[in-house]
Regions:
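Bacterial N-terminal signal peptides that target proteins for export
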Residues: 1-8
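Bacterial N-terminal signal peptides
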Residues: 8-16
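Terminal targeting/pro-maturation regions of precursor/exported proteins
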Residues: 19-141, 174-176
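Cleft-lining beta-strand/loop regions that shape enzyme active-site pockets
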Residues: 26, 30-34, 46, 50, ...
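PDZ/PDZ-like groove recognition
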Residues: 60-68, 76-83, 162-178, 182, ...
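PDZ/PDZ-like peptide-tail recognition elements
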Residues: 126, 137-180
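Conserved functional hotspot residues or short segments at active or partner-binding sites
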Residues: 426-432, 436-473
Length: 473
C-alpha cells in the first residue's frame, strides 16, 4: 500500500475543479470541497485503477449507492434519474456532480448528522463509495474520516485510548480470545490474562456485538469486520471506563472495570527461545516497522541468537516500502519485488544492503498472511535465504494507493499488481510454504508459545536442524 504525497493531491484538486463548469458548481448545493472529493475520486479511479474502468458502471454505482443509503436511513421514496456515460470523462464528471447535487437538494433535509458528518457529506460519501465499488474490487474503497484515522493508527504507530490487549474473535464460542496483555497496561492492572475469554462488553454480549459481521462469508473480511466492531467499543478516550465480563478456564469471573489509557502499540515483538533462537513477530507493515525490526534483531544478536523465526501469521500487510525494508534485513542483495502498473510498466525494487549476517531463518505464514507480508515471504522464499513454514498464504498480489482528502477521509484504490523476484503472480493463488504445518480450527492454543504452537515448534525444529548441519560441517 502506498500513500500519495500532498503535492500529488494538490495537483489532483486543481484538476477536479476544471472538470466541473463554473456555472454548474456555483449553483450546486455541494461545497467546493465536496466537489473536489467527488470528482477527484472519479478521476483517480478512471486514471489509476489497475484495470480499465467501465464508466457506465461507475456512474450507475454512484446512483445506486446513494439510493440505497437514503432508503437505509428512512428515506423510503428516494429516486434519482439514470445517468448515461460518454467517452468524455469531463462530461461524465459533470453528470456525476449534477446527480449528487440533485440528491443533496431533494433528500439532505430528510437526514440528520451522523458522527458529525453533515447530510450533504453523507450523500457525497455514498456516491464516492458507489463509484469505487463499481469496479468490484474488494480493496478499492472509500474511507470515512473515522475509518482513515483508524487505518493510520494501525500503520503509523499512532497512540490511541484503549485497554491494552490484543485479541481474536472466536467464532465458535462467540467470545474474544485474549492473545496478549501489555505489561503494566490497564488490563494488566485489573488482572486480565492471556487465554481469558471476554464474553460481554459494557453488558452487551460479544455474540450480539459480532452478529452484523457474521453474514460475511470471506474469512478475512469477516475477521476484519469483527475486529472493527470490537475496537470501536474497547477503544475510547483515555480516562474513560469500560466494563468487561470475563471467563477463565471455563469459569466466569467477577466483571472488571478498566480505565482506558493511552496505548502505544508496537508492530514488532521479539523474544529469545530456548537454544538461542530469536523469535520476531510482525503484526503489521507500518511506518515504524523496519526501525523496530532493526532494533529487535540487534538486541537478539547481542544475546547470542543462532537463528531466527520471523512470524508473519495473520499479518494483513501494510506499506510497500515497509515490506521492502523488512525484506532487506534478511536479503543482502538482488530483487525484492516487481510492481506493474496498468500501462504494463514494471518497477523493480532491490534490497538496500542493510541485511544482518546470514543465519538459519524460518518464516511462519498462514491463510491470513497477506499483501506486504506476502511480498516479504515471497522474496525470502525466492532468494533462498529462508524457509516458509505453515499453510498457504492469502493470495493478495495487488498494491493499493491511498489518496487522502482534505476533510480527513480518503479513497483507497488498487493501482498495480506485483510479482515475486522469480516472476510469480500470487494474486488469488497464495504462496505455498516448503514445510506444511497446520493448526486444527477447534484447537485452543496461544500463538508464539513454544509449548503449544505446532507451527512454531516446526519452525524451531527446522532452524535447529540447520544449526546442527552447520556445526557438523
Amino acid at each position: 500500500m502506498k500513500r500519495i504525497a500532498p503535492v500529488a493531491l494538490a495537483a489532483l484538486l486543481a484538476l477536479t475543479v476544471a472538470r466541473v463548469p463554473a456555472a454548474t458548481a456555483a449553483s450546486s448545493p455541494l461545497s467546493s470541497l465536496q466537489t473536489e472529493e467527488l470528482v477527484g475520486s472519479y478521476v483517480r479511479l478512471t486514471a489509476d485503477f489497475y484495470k480499465k474502468v467501465d464508466r457506465q458502471a461507475a456512474l450507475d454505482g454512484a446512483r445506486t449507492s446513494m439510493i440505497e443509503y437514503l432508503k437505509k436511513h428512512n428515506v423510503a421514496n428516494a429516486s434519482l434519474p439514470p445517468l448515461h456515460a460518454t467517452a468524455d470523462d469531463e462530461t461524465n464528471a459533470e453528470a456525476l456532480h449534477r446527480e449528487v447535487s440533485t440528491a443533496v437538494t431533494d433528500y439532505a433535509p430528510k437526514l440528520t448528522p451522523v458522527d458529525s458528518i453533515s447530510p450533504s457529506s453523507q450523500i457525497t460519501y455514498a456516491a464516492i463509495a458507489g463509484v469505487l465499488g463499481s469496479v468490484k474490487d474488494r480493496y478499492t474503497t472509500f474511507l470515512s474520516p473515522k475509518e482513515y484515522a483508524a487505518l493510520n493508527e494501525g500503520l503509523d504507530g499512532t497512540s490511541f485510548g484503549g485497554v491494552g490487549i490484543s485479541y481474536l474473535p472466536d467464532d465458535k464460542t462467540q467470545t474474544l480470545h485474549v492473545e496478549s496483555v501489555i505489561l503494566d497496561g490497564p488490563s494488566d492492572k485489573v488482572g486480565l490474562q492471556p487465554e481469558d475469554a471476554i464474553t460481554a462488553i459494557d453488558g452487551k454480549a460479544v455474540s450480539e456485538l459480532l452478529a452484523p459481521a457474521q453474514t460475511e462469508k470471506d474469512d478475512q473480511r469477516r475477521l476484519a469486520a469483527e475486529q472493527k466492531i470490537v475496537s470501536g467499543v474497547l477503544r475510547g478516550n483515555p480516562g474513560t471506563k469500560v466494563r468487561l465480563t470475563v471467563q477463565r478456564n471455563g469459569k466466569m469471573l467477577e466483571p472488571v472495570t478498566i480505565t482506558r489509557e493511552t496505548i502505544h502499540a508496537p508492530s514488532v515483538t521479539s523474544k529469545m527461545l530456548p537454544g538461542n533462537i530469536g523469535y520476531v513477530d510482525l503484526s503489521v507493515f507500518g511506518q515504524s516497522t523496519a526501525t523496530e525490526l532493526t532494533a529487535a534483531l540487534k538486541r537478539l544478536d547481542s544475546q547470542g541468537a543462532k537463528a531466527y523465526v520471523l512470524d508473519l501469521r495473520s499479518n494483513g500487510g501494510g506499506y510497500l516500502n515497509a515490506a521492502i525494508d523488512v525484506s532487506s534485513k534478511f536479503i543482502s542483495s538482488g530483487p525484492i519485488v516487481s510492481v506493474q502498473s496498468r500501462a504494463g510498466v514494471d518497477t523493480e525494487y532491490d534490497a538496500d544492503n542493510t541485511a544482518i549476517a546470514p543465519r538459519p531463518l524460518a518464516v511462519l505464514v498462514n491463510q491470513y498472511t497477506a499483501s506486504a507480508s506476502e511480498i516479504t515471504a515471497g522474496a525470502i522464499q525466492d532468494s533462498g535465504v529462508g524457509t516458509l513454514v505453515g499453510v498457504k498464504t492469502f493470495g493478495k498480489g495487488v498494491v493499493q494507493s491511498i489518496f487522502p482528502m482534505r476533510d480527513g477521509s480518503a479513497v483507497k484504490i488498487t493501482t498495480a499488481r506485483y510479482f515475486t523476484p522469480k516472476g510469480r503472480d500470487i494474486n488469488s493463488v497464495g504462496i505455498e510454504p516448503e514445510i506444511k504445518s497446520d493448526i486444527p480450527k477447534d484447537a485452543k492454543i496461544r500463538l508464539g508459545d513454544l509449548s503449544q504452537d505446532p507451527q512454531l515448534i516446526a519452525a524451531v525444529s527446522f532452524v535447529n536442524s540447520r544449526i546442527a548441519q552447520a556445526t557438523t560441517h
